[in-house]
């Protein structure tokens, strides 16, 4: 990719399919609405004295003719001049400015059902099948033939922006010393042969998947993968595990990459990686009991450098892991696209593989296929020092992660729907109750809400720690003996309503997080100092998401997981099924306040307690209705 080193700030425009409906521009919410919602969101989460100070600062910011209105006008002008007024601000803030290492901290993983590979050929057949599915899906993208997504859940039926899909196989996150760059591959009329990178035994190989404008068959791919597996065993050809460098902090990796780029051999190898469609990581055995928790850990960090942690290249958006022991899934660099896009793509691949696996796959004997190429590296002592440092830091990440994949089996979304409640709102309120049960407080909570109803829309935040949720959790724990079941039920309904209303605001572009971010970044561009509203302790607190949550629903046999976003926080990803709910809960062992196992147990207690409350109240409602019917019948009988 010749322009990788250039400053590429502008996102490449995707050509829209003629069948793809136009979606509107993201609105800029009214200033006063956002300021009032901000105060409402934070009032019960900070000390009273601190809130009084914040309220005064916010009122000053929002005064008629004041600074807030000036910044709002600039944002509204920006909306007219750009496709999406918050896109670049959000991308920088959420991902590209973040200096933390990608494993656990940023890159989510999807774990497939465990495969039963009898031998290495089974592993390679699975990988060949998967690569064939990637080619199939990429062909849909290249021809803009992917069916348009429509919104589900709240306000369902609206068409969604499809641009994120075109970053699945054409993007690359380039490390920078202070800020990363999201690079998009430029399409050309006569494309060169497409290739993927195969990681095997910490070595990297180029596998051409199209030769002479002919797509390789699964048999061809299997043949080539067998060659790679054999090449990777050659001890004499073994090179340092350069993929380890991508597990480091972004600034450290940028420094190491600058050193690598001084040598032409390294430049050529980096260029091949940066232009590839995706990675396929042929992992060795993990050496652990293969339950959901341990399989997820293998995808999140590979078990460290002495297992499969160096058999990766984290800058590439799509890494497909195929482990010798049947641990398979996807590791995703999150900056080009959101979770639902990753899930839709993965679902398509798994369906393709299920259909394709019915055929017996044999190696094709095509002698004219060129052998895959091993990527070569020239490693200076400086790079060797970087590799040693990266390996040590990856081990720290591995040891520090406290993770559990927990299946709640007592009920699922079918029971929740019978309560005439959104499963997502119900689970979010249950998570607030669980957190309060563990820590006796609520904290700023992040739940991602898609804004793909708008052009270039990514996500905004549903702030689930509402005042109504706070009233409910206190009723269930602090005021339990004093309140009747009907009073608790009313507070539960209020919490569900508040969560649902905020969700609707978020998906329609009216939530507060993106708006406040836009105002802050416009102020940064136009003034020497940030306005006090953005340096105030309450604003800083509001952006430390101690509870980071996401619903990733899928009917397929797979699940998603990720790490916490702050040192004293939790990641909580969940997949509601008809009769169970799967939770993936993460925290850090360094933090003595948090425990993933403790939160998982609290989630179970909370879900059972809410179910019992619903059952009691529906039972008493049924009895009350029966009594009313009986009284009506008696009056009727008397008249007769």
Swiss-Prot record:
The active site is at residue 334. It catalyses: choline + acetyl-CoA = acetylcholine + CoA. GO terms for molecular function: choline O-acetyltransferase activity. GO terms for biological process: acetylcholine biosynthetic process; neuromuscular synaptic transmission; response to growth hormone. The gene is CHAT. CoA binds at residues 412-424, 450, 551. Catalyzes the reversible synthesis of acetylcholine (ACh) from acetyl CoA and choline at cholinergic synapses. It comes from Gallus gallus (Chicken). Keywords: Acyltransferase, Neurotransmitter biosynthesis, Transferase. This is Choline O-acetyltransferase. GO terms for cellular component: cytoplasm; neuron projection; synapse. Residues 1-28 are annotated as: Disordered. Detected in brain and in embryonic retina.
């Amino acid at each position: 990719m010749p322009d990788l080193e250039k400053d590429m700030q502008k996102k490449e425009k995707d050509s829209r399919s003629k069948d793809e409906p136009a979606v509107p521009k993201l609105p800029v919410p009214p200033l006063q609405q956002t300021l009032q919602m901000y105060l409402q969101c934070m009032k019960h989460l900070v000390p009273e004295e601190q809130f009084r100070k914040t309220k005064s600062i916010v009122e000053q910011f929002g005064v008629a003719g004041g600074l807030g209105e000036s910044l709002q006008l600039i944002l509204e002008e920006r909306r007219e001049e750009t496709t999406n007024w918050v896109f670049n601000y959000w991308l920088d803030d959420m991902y590209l400015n973040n200096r933390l290492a990608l494993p656990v901290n940023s890159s989510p993983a999807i774990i497939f059902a465990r495969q039963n590979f009898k031998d290495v050929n089974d592993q390679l057949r699975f990988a060949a099948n998967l690569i064939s599915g990637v080619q199939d899906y990429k062909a849909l993208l290249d021809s803009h033939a992917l069916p348009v997504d429509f919104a589900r859940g709240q306000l369902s039926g609206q068409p969604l922006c499809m641009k994120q899909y075109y970053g699945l196989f054409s993007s690359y996150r380039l490390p920078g010393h202070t800020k990363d760059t999201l690079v998009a591959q430029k399409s050309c009329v006569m494309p060169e042969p497409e290739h993927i990178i195969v990681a095997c035994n910490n070595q990297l190989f180029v596998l051409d998947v199209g030769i002479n404008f002919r797509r390789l068959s699964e048999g061809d791919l299997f043949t080539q993968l067998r060659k790679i597996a054999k090449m990777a065993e050659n001890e004499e050809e073994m090179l340092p595990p350069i993929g380890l460098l991508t597990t480091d902090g972004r600034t450290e990796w940028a420094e190491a990459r600058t050193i690598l780029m001084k040598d032409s051999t390294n430049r050529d190898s980096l260029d091949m990686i940066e232009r590839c469609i995706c990675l396929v990581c042929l992992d060795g055995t993990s050496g652990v009991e293969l339950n959901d928790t341990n399989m997820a850990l293998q995808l999140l960090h590979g078990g460290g450098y002495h297992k499969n942690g160096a058999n990766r290249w984290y800058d590439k958006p799509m890494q497909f892991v195929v482990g010798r022991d049947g641990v398979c899934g996807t590791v995703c660099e999150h900056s080009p696209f959101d979770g639902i896009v990753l899930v839709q793509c993965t679902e398509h691949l798994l369906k393709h593989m299920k259909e394709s696996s019915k055929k017996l796959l044999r190696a094709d004997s095509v002698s004219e296929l060129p052998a895959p190429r091993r990527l070569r590296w020239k490693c200076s002592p400086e790079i060797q020092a970087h590799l040693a440092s990266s390996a040590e830091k990856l081990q720290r990440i591995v040891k520090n992660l406290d993770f559990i994949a927990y299946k709640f089996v007592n009920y699922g979304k079918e029971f929740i729907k019978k309560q005439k409640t959104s499963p997502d709102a119900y689970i979010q309120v249950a998570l607030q109750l669980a957190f309060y049960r563990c820590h006796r407080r609520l904290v700023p909570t992040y739940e991602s809400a898609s804004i793909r109803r708008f052009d270039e829309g990514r996500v905004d935040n549903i702030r689930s720690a509402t005042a109504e949720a706070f009233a409910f959790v206190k009723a269930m724990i602090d005021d339990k003996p004093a309140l009747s079941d009907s009073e608790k039920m009313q507070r539960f309904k209020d919490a569900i309503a508040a969560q649902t209303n905020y969700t609707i605001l978020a998906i329609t572009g009216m939530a507060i997080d993106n708006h406040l971010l836009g105002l802050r970044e416009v102020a940064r561009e136009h003034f020497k100092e940030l306005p006090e509203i953005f340096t105030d302790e309450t604003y800083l607190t509001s952006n430390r998401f101690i509870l980071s949550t996401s619903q990733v629903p899928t009917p397929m046999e797979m699940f998603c997981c990720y790490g916490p976003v702050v040192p004293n926080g939790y990641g909580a990803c969940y997949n509601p099924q008809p009769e169970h709910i799967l939770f993936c809960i993460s925290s850090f062992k360094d933090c003595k306040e948090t425990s993933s196992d403790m939160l998982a147990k609290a989630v179970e207690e909370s879900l059972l307690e809410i179910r019992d409350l619903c059952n009691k109240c529906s039972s008493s409602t049924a009895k009350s209705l029966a009594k009313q019917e009986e009284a009506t019948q008696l009056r009727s009988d008397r008249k007769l």
